[in-house]
Amino acid sequence: MLTRKQQELLLFIHGTNEGNPGVPPSFDEMKDALDLASKSGIHRLITALEERGFIRRLPNRARALEVIKLPEAYAGASQVRRGFSPTVIEGSLGKLASPPPAPKPAPPAEAASVAVPVMGRIAAGVPISAIQNNMHDISVPVEMIGSGEHYALEIKGDSMIEAGILDGDTVIIRNGSTASPGDIVVALIDDEEATLKRFRRKGASIALEAANPAYETRIFGPDRVKIQGRLVGLIRRYH
């Protein structure tokens, strides 16, 4: 499973080559297409795509990449229409142009993991300003997340301790705008503050319920709260 940015870059490279065979996108074009601030982000995405087997560096051809496969959702349709063959992209890749390393054996299925972007910190306490920048990626077991788009957030605060969520934990969130009563959700309040709380309904209003008796349940009108996803997993590091 690819992150959204990895998938966007892979499809952009493949689409550019199809539309202009032999004319690769430059790093500036890739950076602008993905709305990234610097080229270093493109380097990291290309490396991640290579590690996941979607592209490879070509030996004996300076500054060349080969698109080996597309994500299943795109590859199937592509093969039906015209048959998919690897796409070769040549360009100025700097250090990325070195010959590819020897293939590594695939890990056993139970050890498979995916990269999930850590988007910032979220309050399990008093709401803090929402952070929407990709800080880094975290490796998450495939069986933890299942289908859908996911992101991760680092917990700040102790309002969810009775739900087993502690300060410093990393929570895995399935992106979505709906929730069922009892779900633990990322709630955006007044488009300004984000908090992790249990979702409840109180008549026509929305209640954000803590899992710590030191914190009061907060009630909002439905137009003030937007659901940004629901909790599906948690990662804790012991120091």
From Swiss-Prot:
What the protein does comes down to: Represses a number of genes involved in the response to DNA damage (SOS response), including recA and lexA. In the presence of single-stranded DNA, RecA interacts with LexA causing an autocatalytic cleavage which disrupts the DNA-binding part of LexA, leading to derepression of the SOS regulon and eventually DNA repair.
Organism equals: Rhizobium radiobacter (Agrobacterium tumefaciens)
Protein name in the entry: LexA repressor
- What EC number(s) are associated with this protein in UniProt? 3.4.21.88
Site entry (Cleavage), positions:
124-125
* Subunit-structure text: Homodimer.
Q: Where is the active site?
A: 159 (for autocatalytic cleavage activity), 197 (for autocatalytic cleavage activity)
Tell me its family.
Answer: Belongs to the peptidase S24 family.
**What PANTHER family does UniProt report for this protein, alphabetically?**
LEXA REPRESSOR, LEXA REPRESSOR-RELATED
Q: Which residues bind DNA?
A: 27-47
The uppermost taxa in this organism's lineage are:
Bacteria, Pseudomonadati, Pseudomonadota, Alphaproteobacteria, Hyphomicrobiales
